[in-house]
C-alpha cells in the first residue's frame, strides 16, 4: 500500500521554502506522492453547493498557487516523490497546451507525474474562465482524456472531437512514463465510476467527510460498479488503481462515543481504518496533515509516518 500527502499551499503564510521543506521531508519519510489542488480563480458569489461540507459553503479563502507551476517548482527540489494533481479540472485549460505542460513536466521530473482529473463543480469559475459550458463538463473531460492519450502516445497525433481537434502536427517530447502519464479519475458519482472504468488508470475519490463518508462497504459497492464498466470497455479492472483521499485527522480531538469519524483519533484507530480500506480494495491513501502552524504540520507528517504507516 502506498501513502501520499496533500500539499499545504492554500495560505499566503506558507512560503516557498516551507513547501520545499514539506516535500523533501515527505520524500525522506518514504511517502509515495504529494497532491496539489486546482482552482484558477474563486468567484465571490458561488451558486452551486460545495459537495464536501454540511452547509454547502466552500471553505477556502481563494488563495491557490497554480497547480502545474507548483508541481514543476517542487519536482525540481526533489528526486523521487511523485506529484499528483488532485484534482485538475479538465475543462479549464486548453487540452493541447495542458498535455504539453504535463508531458514536459514528466520529462523534466523523470516520470514523476500523475494526473488526477475531475469535471469541476464551481459553475461561476467555468463562466469566468470562458471554459466550455458547465453542463457539458463531463463530455468535455471524456474527450480531453482521449486527446491527452493521443498526444502522448501517437507518433502522428490526430483527433477530431466536438471540443478538441488537431491533425498533421508534431507533439514532442512524449512523456517518460509508458505508455503514458497515469490518469486518475476524481469523484464518486456514477459518471465518475464509469469514467474511471472506461478511461482511467485510477479512481481517486474523497472519503471520510460528513457529506460523503465513503465507508469501506461503500468502496466495495462502488468498485463492483467500476468493474462492470471496465469489463464492458474490454479492460481489466485489476489494472485500475484505487487512491482514496482521507479527511483531515486529528490525534488529539476528543470524539464522543458513537460519533467517531474515520481517520480521527489515536494511531491505533487510524491504522485500523487504513486496514479496513485496504481490505475493501484501496491501494493508495492520501492524507491532509495541515495544522495551525507549519512546524506542527511537519511534526504531524512525521507522526503519521512513524506511528501509523509503519504499523500497516
Identify the meaning behind each predicted range.
Residues 1-312:
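Active-site-adjacent structural elements that line small-molecule/cofactor binding pockets in enzymes
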Amino acid at each position: 500500500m502506498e501513502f501520499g500527502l496533500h500539499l499545504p499551499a492554500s495560505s499566503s503564510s506558507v512560503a516557498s521554502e516551507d513547501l520545499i521543506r514539506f516535500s523533501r521531508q515527505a520524500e525522506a519519510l518514504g511517502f509515495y506522492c504529494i497532491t496539489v489542488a486546482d482552482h484558477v480563480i474563486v468567484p465571490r458569489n458561488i451558486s452551486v453547493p460545495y459537495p464536501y461540507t454540511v452547509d454547502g459553503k466552500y471553505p477556502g479563502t481563494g488563495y491557490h498557487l497554480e497547480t502545474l507551476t507548483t508541481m514543476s517548482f517542487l519536482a525540481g527540489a526533489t528526486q523521487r516523490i511523485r506529484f499528483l494533481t488532485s484534482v485538475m479540472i479538465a475543462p479549464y485549460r486548453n487540452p493541447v497546451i495542458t498535455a504539453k505542460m504535463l508531458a514536459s513536466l514528466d520529462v523534466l521530473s523523470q516520470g514523476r507525474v500523475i494526473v488526477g482529473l475531475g469535471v469541476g463543480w464551481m459553475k461561476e469559475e467555468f463562466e469566468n474562465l470562458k471554459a466550455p459550458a458547465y453542463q457539458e463538463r463531463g463530455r468535455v473531460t471524456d474527450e480531453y482524456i482521449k486527446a491527452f492519450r493521443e498526444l502522448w502516445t501517437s507518433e502522428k497525433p490526430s483527433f477530431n472531437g466536438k471540443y478538441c481537434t488537431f491533425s498533421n502536427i508534431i507533439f514532442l517530447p512524449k512523456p517518460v512514463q509508458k505508455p503514458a502519464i497515469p490518469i486518475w479519475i476524481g469523484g464518486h458519482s456514477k459518471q465518475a465510476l464509469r469514467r474511471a472504468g472506461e478511461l482511467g488508470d485510477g479512481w481517486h475519490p474523497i472519503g471520510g467527510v460528513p457529506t460523503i463518508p465513503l465507508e469501506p462497504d461503500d468502496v466495495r459497492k462502488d468498485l463492483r460498479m467500476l468493474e462492470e464498466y471496465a469489463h464492458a470497455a474490454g479492460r481489466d479492472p485489476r489494472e485500475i488503481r484505487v487512491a482514496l483521499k482521507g479527511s483531515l485527522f486529528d490525534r488529539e480531538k476528543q470524539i464522543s462515543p458513537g460519533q467517531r469519524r474515520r481517520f480521527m483519533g489515536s494511531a491505533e484507530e487510524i491504522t485500523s481504518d487504513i486496514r479496513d480500506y485496504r481490505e475493501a480494495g484501496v491501494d493508495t491513501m492520501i492524507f491532509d496533515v495541515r495544522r495551525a502552524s507549519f512546524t506542527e504540520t511537519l511534526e504531524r507528517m512525521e507522526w503519521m509516518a512513524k506511528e501509523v504507516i509503519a504499523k500497516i
